[in-house]
A protein has these predicted regions:
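Alpha-helical transmembrane segments of multi-pass membrane transport proteins
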Residues: 1-433
Length: 433
C-alpha cells in the first residue's frame, strides 16, 4: 500500500471517529490499528500496540504531569487569585484600562502557578469581572483581555505542556524548555497589554488607580508566598537541585502547606481536588499512551517522511517552510486540544523543522505558542468558551474585540519562529545549551 493511501486512511479514520464523538484516545488507538492492518498481522498489531502503549508512559519524567496537575488544582482552590490581582494592580493601576491590564498580568502569574490556561481564565476572570463591571468596563473588552492572555501560562513555566513535548521529542531537556518559554510567554503577555492599552485609549477609559484599602507592603506580603513557588520550583530544576518530577513533588508539598496556612481547603475539598486531579491525569496519560502507538504506526509506515518530502517539494526556502508549518499547526490548534496535538504532530513536524536548522527547543516553543492561539479560537477553543461564560458575553460579542489580540499574537508567533534568540537566548545565557 502506498504511503499516500496509508496517510489518508490514518487521518480519515481518526477524523471520522472524532466527528462521531468517539473519545480522542479511543480514536487514536482505533485509527492506528486500522492503519497497521495494511502492513502487519493481527498478532503483530496486538503485541506491538500494547508494547508501545505501555512504554509510552514508562518515562519517569511523565510522573511530573499528574503532580503539576495536583499542585495547580490546589492553587486554583487556594484563594490566590485575589492576592495576585491586588499585586498586579501595584504595577498597572495608573494605566488606562488598568483592570484589564491587571487581568493580563494576573493571568501570566496565575497561569505560571497553575499551568492551566482554562484555570487562569476562570479564576482571574471570575475575580476581576465583577470589579470591571462596577467600573463601567465593556464586558466584551474585559472578556477579550482575559481570554487572550490566559494561555500565557502554557509557555511560562512550570507547565506540563513542555514535559509532554519533551517525552515525545526524545527526551529534550525539560529545564531548557522551561527557560526557553519565559521570553515568548512574556512577549505574549506584553502584546496583550499593548492591545488592551490601545483599546482603552480609543474608548476613553480612565485608570482605576491602585487599591489603597491595604498597604503596598501588605499586598506584596500576601502575594509573595504564591510567587515564591515559581522561584523554588524553577530555580531548583534549572540549578540541578532536583529533577522536573521531584520539582513537581515539591510544588505539591508547598501548595499543601500554603492551603493549610490560608485555611482555604478543608478535608472534603481536598478529596475533591485529588479526585479531579486523578481524572485529568488519567485522561492525559492515556492520551500519551495511545499516541505512542500512533507514533509507531506513522514512523513504521513512513508518514512523517512522506509529509516532509511533500512540503520540501513545494519549496526549499526554510522561511516559507516554517510559515507553512505555522499555518498548519495553527489550524490544528483550532480543532484539537494541546496534549493530543503535541503527541500526534511532533513526530511529523519536528524532523522537518530540524532538517531546516531549527532546534528541538525552538520548535517546542513554536508548537506550544500555536496551541495557545488555538485555545482562544473556535470551534474547540476551551479558553474562549470559559472566558465568555465567566464574562457573561456571547462569542459573537467578543470576537470583534479578540481580533486585534489575535493579530498581535500571530506577529509575536512569527517573531518567535524567525528570531531564535527569543527562545534560545535565555537558556544559552544560563549555560543550558
Amino acid at each position: 500500500m502506498s504511503i499516500t493511501l496509508t496517510t489518508v486512511i490514518l487521518f480519515a479514520v481518526f477524523g471520522v471517529l472524532l466527528f462521531l464523538g468517539v473519545p480522542i484516545s479511543i480514536s487514536i488507538v482505533v485509527s492506528s490499528i486500522v492503519t497497521a492492518m495494511s502492513t502487519l498481522s493481527w498478532d503483530q498489531i496486538t503485541f506491538i500496540t500494547m508494547q508501545k502503549m505501555n512504554s509510552g508512559v514508562e518515562s519517569f519524567s511523565l510522573l511530573a504531569v499528574p503532580l503539576f496537575i495536583l499542585a495547580g488544582n490546589i492553587m486554583n482552590n487556594g484563594g490566590i487569585a485575589k492576592r495576585l490581582v491586588n499585586f498586579a494592580q501595584l504595577f498597572v493601576g495608573k494605566i488606562p484600562g488598568s483592570m484589564a491590564q491587571a487581568n493580563i498580568l494576573g493571568n501570566m502569574l496565575f497561569g505560571a502557578l497553575s499551568g492551566s490556561s482554562v484555570a487562569a481564565a476562570s479564576a482571574m476572570g471570575g475575580c476581576i469581572s465583577p470589579i470591571e463591571e462596577e467600573n463601567g468596563y465593556d464586558p466584551a473588552y474585559s472578556a477579550a483581555a482575559n481570554i487572550a492572555s490566559a494561555p500565557t501560562g502554557l509557555l511560562i513555566p512550570p507547565t506540563s505542556a513542555f514535559i509532554v513535548y519533551s517525552t515525545v521529542a526524545g527526551g529534550v531537556s525539560i529545564s531548557t524548555l522551561f527557560m526557553a518559554g519565559y521570553i515568548p510567554g512574556i512577549l505574549m503577555g506584553l502584546c496583550c497589554m499593548i492591545v488592551a492599552f490601545i483599546g482603552a485609549k480609543k474608548a476613553g477609559m480612565k485608570a482605576t488607580g491602585i487599591d489603597h484599602s491595604q498597604s503596598i507592603a501588605k499586598t506584596v506580603w500576601d502575594a509573595a508566598p504564591s510567587l515564591l513557588l515559581i522561584v523554588i520550583v524553577i530555580g531548583g530544576i534549572v540549578s540541578g537541585i532536583f529533577t522536573a518530577t521531584e520539582g513537581a513533588g515539591v510544588a505539591v508539598l508547598y501548595c499543601l502547606i500554603l492551603s493549610i496556612i490560608y485555611k482555604s481547603i478543608d478535608f472534603k475539598g481536598f478529596l475533591g481536588i485529588l479526585l479531579n486531579s486523578a481524572k485529568t491525569s488519567g485522561i492525559i496519560l492515556f492520551l500519551i499512551s495511545a499516541s505512542s502507538a500512533m507514533s509507531f504506526v506513522m514512523a513504521y509506515s513512513g508518514i512523517p517522511a512522506a509529509i516532509s518530502n511533500g512540503l520540501m517539494s513545494l519549496t526549499d526556502n526554510k522561511y516559507i517552510i516554517f510559515l507553512l508549518m505555522n499555518i498548519i499547526l495553527l489550524v490544528i490548534g483550532m480543532f484539537m486540544d494541546i496534549t493530543p496535538a503535541i503527541l500526534i504532530f511532533t513526530p511529523i513536524f519536528l524532523p522537518i523543522a530540524t532538517s531546516f536548522g531549527m532546534t528541538e527547543i525552538q520548535f517546542g516553543v513554536m508548537l506550544i505558542f500555536n496551541m495557545c492561539l488555538g485555545n482562544i479560537t473556535p470551534p474547540v477553543g476551551s479558553v474562549l468558551f470559559v472566558g465568555c461564560g465567566i464574562g457573561h458575553v456571547s462569542i459573537e460579542q467578543v470576537t470583534s474585540k479578540l481580533i486585534p489580540y489575535f493579530v498581535a499574537l500571530v506577529l509575536a508567533l512569527l517573531a518567535v519562529t524567525y528570531i531564535p534568540a527569543l527562545s534560545l537566548g535565555l537558556p544559552s545565557l544560563m549555560g543550558l545549551i
